[in-house]
Amino acid sequence: MSGSNTAISRRRLLQGAGAMWLLSVSQVSLAAVSQVVAVRVWPASSYTRVTVESNRQLKYKQFALSNPERVVVDIEDVNLNSVLKGMAAQIRADDPFIKSARVGQFDPQTVRMVFELKQNVKPQLFALAPVAGFKERLVMDLYPANAQDMQDPLLALLEDYNKGDLEKQVPPAQSGPQPGKAGRDRPIVIMLDPGHGGEDSGAVGKYKTREKDVVLQIARRLRSLIEKEGNMKVYMTRNEDIFIPLQVRVAKAQKQRADLFVSIHADAFTSRQPSGSSVFALSTKGATSTAAKYLAQTQNASDLIGGVSKSGDRYVDHTMFDMVQSLTIADSLKFGKAVLNKLGKINKLHKNQVEQAGFAVLKAPDIPSILVETAFISNVEEERKLKTATFQQEVAESILAGIKAYFADGATLARRG
């Protein structure tokens, strides 16, 4: 009897040990599987971006299929979950590149994503390390296969940027302004730069107002005003919810031979007390204040947040910084002061003078460039104002008034090569 009990106890012990071993192996296997936490699709006329965010860096393979044209991405060590299943619903009917998408568990270790296309594309895939609240990201950008044949300067610059050819595509800096009356010899060319876009939302207010949205609205209003001026021509670095690298923004201004560059933003700080409008210009000798330095650092992080492929990293610290002319910075300060004076008539000023710091987006060596912080989106009252059509229109009108005042004070046009 006792021998029988001993045998039963031994069997139970072995069964328990086996169960514990299986549980342990199961937990190890589960821990080794990457967890996809978000999928985002950003369609735009220039390119469509698909972002897969996960708790671990993803291993992937990409290939193409024909009849119909498809891009296939296999992600290893991932299990299909509700986040991945929801990707198909994110494909918009007006996406220029993706017709539809489907996701499935291809084998026990692999999830397969299949994108049916509306046109031939050049896919580019790269990984982004965690930054600013984002986890590991796998990014797929879909560019049109005939990109070089299209008459879209921004698209061409994006292509050049991602191939590492941006430098030789940008016209060289000129020696200085050319004499002549602005708007009389030729139209004044103005490049508007709505900050952030796509993955990079910019600052977000208490009530979830996103900087990238309000600054695009302000830029569109300003564009409409400038288009009514007979002696001005206007371009925008982006007119969609799309990520544009900082150096591409600068390069587009140079390619369009802009006379002025205006980057539009909505300020934020760690506390909700600061308020008011500000204007910034470039400095090659350090920031004029701690706040200006902090702001430049946060704005310059846009490429890390928005997502720049490794092939473009060489341009982030380009020697363009060393080429900036002191004359251009002096003109930027004059231009900034003219705009700041006009902003002071419609909103409190955070600082009464134009501040300076090393903003990457202001580094065009031959174009007077300013960064306008329209208001503090982190301030609850100013967040409310930023959402209103009235305040947006007032800001747009103030910037245009500043542009006119700058040229009325004797500013000359940028030299044309």
From Swiss-Prot:
GO MF term list: N-acetylmuramoyl-L-alanine amidase activity
Region (Disordered): 166-185
Known catalytic reactions: Hydrolyzes the link between N-acetylmuramoyl residues and L-amino acid residues in certain cell-wall glycopeptides
InterPro entries referenced in this protein's UniProt entry, alphabetically: AmiC, AMIN_dom, MurNAc-LAA_cat, N-acetylmuramoyl_amidase_3, TAT_signal
Entry's localization field: Periplasm
Deletion phenotype: Mutants are growing in chains of 3 to 6 cells.
EC number annotated for this UniProt entry: 3.5.1.28
One of the Pfam families matching this protein, by short name: AMIN
Keywords, alphabetical: Cell wall biogenesis/degradation, Hydrolase, Periplasm, Signal
Single biological process term from Gene Ontology: peptidoglycan catabolic process
Signal peptide annotation: 1-31
An annotated GO cellular component: outer membrane-bounded periplasmic space
Family to which this protein belongs: Belongs to the N-acetylmuramoyl-L-alanine amidase 3 family.
The record's note on its domains: N-terminal domain is required and sufficient for targeting to the septal ring.
Protein name: N-acetylmuramoyl-L-alanine amidase AmiC
Encoding gene, per UniProt annotation: amiC
